[in-house]
């Protein structure tokens, strides 16, 4: 679990997301509260439930990006799902319990990787010993007394020399033959949506077939060392302990990001009696968010302390269109602001992995130097903002379309301009995009 303070979390989010201070503070406090709860004594700890968050704002302003970046910072089981993927129990489609099943799978993978990192040093030593046994087979014990001891000393000295060369990478390209445990044969089962649990049970039933068999392979020492290290580390793990820790990690630290929650409101479903009831999905989500127990192949998982962050644009609906019980389960509401020209400008140039830096790096691979003048970036931001105002407002995603159109010619003929420097200023932007941006009909289809 992350031990970062709210200020540190916001500072990390600021490197990738422009503006939206209120939303950043809300998720930072929620994440920190997970750590605070763990420091509270046991009788009271069980009573402290997470305060779920509802993020409201137009598309393309950073709701999903905040969740994506939070996942990397959280160091906790995290799953992002679209609410529109689920259907009411009884209809064909995924049911909401699969959210917890996805979360526990992610947690098992995380826990296994963490446990393997703990034993990797010891596993590497054992893998080196196995490779040295292949390169330097133990000599047969011939003779007695001093001769045998002398032979052992020589053999140990040789092994240490080879171990040093192995660690320095001098033997990487040499090939060796070794017996590796054959992975259990995976079984692909085609099943209709909503029957994932049954499919998993059948797959796990067949997964043990053929496990434990050895397969002789000829590989380079560099690859052999990695394969043997993984094999030795896996032997040191206790699978039951990994599963127990994974379940506990989900129950105490799990985070679920529910995107597009506005698309399952009752208002969006008016007059569409033939469609699957979206209000039914809300009713199915309710016990999950309130706290229930879900049966998974790793055991029973309680959802009482899982943090839920929901988001939606709420263009056609309002948060009050959600069923009252579900509204009450998202006590913290944060409104995200629409992006201004200055925000677009900062997104283009001020973030750690800005679009400008990405395109400069891409074209640098073909020895084309791309320079963006300040007035060029400003003009790009103005055009993106203007097109959003005239047509559909898709937020920062408009920048992808605009900059792709701007650099279309340069990207196409980059091979012919190796060693050259291309400067993108306001004049260049107007020449490439001016006509399209001003013509509303053209910009509707091109930008």
Curated annotation (Swiss-Prot):
One of its GO biological process terms is: protein unfolding
- Has keyword Cytoplasm? yes
Q: Which GO terms describe its cellular component?
A: HslUV protease complex
List locations, semicolon-separated.
Cytoplasm
MF GO annotations: ATP binding; ATP hydrolysis activity; peptidase activity; proteasome-activating activity
The alphabetized UniProt keywords are:
ATP-binding, Chaperone, Cytoplasm, Nucleotide-binding, Stress response
UniProt-listed Gene3D superfamilies: 1.10.8.60, P-loop containing nucleotide triphosphate hydrolases
Main location per the UniProt record = cytoplasm
Per UniProt, ATP binds at 18, 60-65, 259, 325, 397
Domain of life of the source: Bacteria
Q: Which InterPro entries match?
A: AAA+_ATPase, ATP-dep_Clp_protease_ClpX, ATPase_AAA_core, Clp_ATPase_C, HslU, P-loop_NTPase
Q: Which Pfam families match?
A: AAA (PF00004), AAA_2 (PF07724)
Assembly and binders: A double ring-shaped homohexamer of HslV is capped on each side by a ring-shaped HslU homohexamer. The assembly of the HslU/HslV complex is dependent on binding of ATP.
Give the protein's biological function: ATPase subunit of a proteasome-like degradation complex; this subunit has chaperone activity. The binding of ATP and its subsequent hydrolysis by HslU are essential for unfolding of protein substrates subsequently hydrolyzed by HslV. HslU recognizes the N-terminal part of its protein substrates and unfolds these before they are guided to HslV for hydrolysis.
- UniProt-listed NCBIfam families: hslU (TIGR00390), PRK05201.1 (NF003544)
**Family statement drawn from the similarity comment of this UniProt entry:** Belongs to the ClpX chaperone family. HslU subfamily.
Q: What is this protein called?
A: ATP-dependent protease ATPase subunit HslU
Task: Record the organism.
Answer: Burkholderia ambifaria (strain MC40-6)
């Amino acid at each position: 679990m992350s031990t970062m303070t709210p200020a540190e979390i916001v500072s990390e989010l600021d490197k990738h997301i422009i503006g939206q201070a209120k939303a950043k503070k809300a998720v930072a406090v929620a994440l920190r509260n997970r750590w605070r709860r763990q420091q509270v004594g046991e009788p009271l700890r069980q009573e402290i439930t997470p305060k779920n968050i509802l993020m409201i704002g137009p598309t393309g302003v950073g709701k999903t990006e905040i969740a994506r970046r939070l996942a990397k910072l959280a160091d906790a089981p995290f799953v992002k799902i679209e609410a529109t993927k689920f259907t009411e129990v009884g209809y064909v489609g995924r049911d909401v319990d699969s959210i917890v099943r996805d979360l526990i799978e992610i947690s098992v993978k995380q826990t296994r990787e963490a446990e393997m990192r703990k034993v990797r040093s010891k596993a590497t030593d054992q893998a080196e010993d196995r490779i040295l046994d292949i390169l330097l087979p133990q000599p047969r014990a011939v003779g007695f007394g001093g001769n045998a001891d002398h032979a052992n000393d020589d053999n140990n000295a040789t092994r240490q020399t080879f171990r040093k060369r192995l660690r320095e990478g001098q033997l990487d390209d040499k090939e060796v033959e070794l017996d590796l445990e054959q992975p259990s044969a995976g079984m692909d089962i085609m099943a209709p949506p909503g029957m994932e649990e049954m499919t998993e049970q059948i797959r796990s039933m067949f997964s043990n077939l053929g496990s434990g068999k050895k397969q002789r392979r000829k590989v380079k020492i560099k690859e052999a060392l990695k394969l043997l290290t993984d094999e030795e580390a896996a032997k040191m793990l206790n699978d039951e302990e990994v599963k127990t820790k994974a379940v506990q990690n989900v129950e105490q630290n799990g985070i679920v990001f529910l995107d597009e929650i506005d698309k399952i409101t009752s208002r969006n479903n008016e007059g569409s009696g033939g469609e699957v009831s979206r209000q039914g999905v809300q009713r199915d989500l309710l016990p999950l968010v309130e706290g229930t127990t879900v049966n998974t192949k790793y055991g029973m998982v309680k959802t009482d302390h899982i943090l839920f962050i929901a988001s939606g644009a709420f263009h056609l609906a309002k948060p009050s269109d959600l069923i009252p019980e579900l509204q009450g389960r998202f006590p913290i509401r944060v409104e995200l602001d629409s992006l201004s020209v200055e925000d677009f400008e900062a997104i283009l140039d001020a973030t750690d992995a800005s679009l400008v830096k990405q395109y400069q790096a891409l074209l640098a691979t073909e020895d084309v130097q791309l320079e963006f003048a300040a007035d060029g970036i400003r003009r790009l931001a103005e055009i993106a903002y203007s097109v959003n105002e005239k047509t559909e407002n898709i937020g920062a995603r408009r920048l992808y379309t605009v900059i792709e159109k701007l650099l279309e010619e340069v990207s196409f003929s980059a091979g012919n301009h190796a060693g050259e420097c291309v400067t993108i200023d306001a004049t260049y932007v107007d020449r490439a995009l001016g006509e399209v941006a001003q013509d509303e009909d053209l910009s509707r289809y091109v930008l």
